[in-house]
């Protein structure tokens, strides 16, 4: 292989150089400290597992199986999967490894691998960070998760200009159940909603039971008042539909109270991972960015695969995506070589204060540390730090 090809990386995989790595690592630490302050306990999950464990979501989310790298275990001969999402692993921990009663709060951070990018120009090796709450089915748990997600993003971004989208799969799901639609028609409608294809939606819904309601759901997806005005009374009286609608209204009201300067929108037909989520869904977007900065929702019963179904809600984000375009100059102090005790004491004190200090080796001079920003100099019998 030519030398020119030995340094090439696969598509969607990149090195993270010091100026950005410092930003990412600082955010990771701040985020985990923030989550700890909210009561979320850190867990580490293995990079590989038997595919049966990682594929628990594949029955409801075929996309996850498609993005999971698979290899043969040289010890057992069984099929292993490289984690593409940590949620199944946390579900296994909650259901089997740490099967406590009551509410459990978890957080995690680590690299996941995808066989193909999940969004345009996204990494195939994102640094996933997330938080999950198990054991509480109330709307308050969902609202807490949205609040925690926004607080975490605030660590990296000024919330000005950001946009929170709220949705609820229960609206579409209860309408599908009431109309008695087949799985194929349900999937076709979901696809039309995702593409915002209103002309096609209008044509398709003409022949469906509650067709005008399905059309109204897409036509007025971002305006709850207009949506209610155009829905039939039968649908508005449906207990499941009404509960979902009320939950969405309550969430909107409470998040507006907690985050008064945040732009919040509604999209009742945002059905990403529709077969996986079971209730409220939420995502935060930045200007000129197609993919969300963070997203999550409710996914009750996720632990059933491991023998313990529990209510669950949570969110995740890619720390690399959160830090796109952010770079930090790393202040580096250069100290002269030598064994002078006063010098060594000054170096130790500076490092203890959180500064980065490099002591020169042998006869090296400043040119050996081209990224140095400061130097340690002796002045009036005191070692001082001066900008270069």
Curated annotation (Swiss-Prot):
InterPro entries: aa-tRNA-synth_II/BPL/LPL, HisRS-like_core, HisRS/HisZ, HisZ
Short name of any one Pfam family annotated for the protein: tRNA-synt_His
Name of the protein described by the UniProt record: ATP phosphoribosyltransferase regulatory subunit
The organism of origin for this protein: Acinetobacter baylyi (strain ATCC 33305 / BD413 / ADP1)
Principal location class: cytoplasm
Disulfide bridge map: none
Function of the molecule: Required for the first step of histidine biosynthesis. May allow the feedback regulation of ATP phosphoribosyltransferase activity by histidine.
Protein's cellular compartments: Cytoplasm
Family, as annotated: Belongs to the class-II aminoacyl-tRNA synthetase family. HisZ subfamily.
Lineage: superkingdom: Bacteria
GO cellular component: cytoplasm
Gene Ontology molecular-function annotations: histidine-tRNA ligase activity
Keywords: Amino-acid biosynthesis, Cytoplasm, Histidine biosynthesis
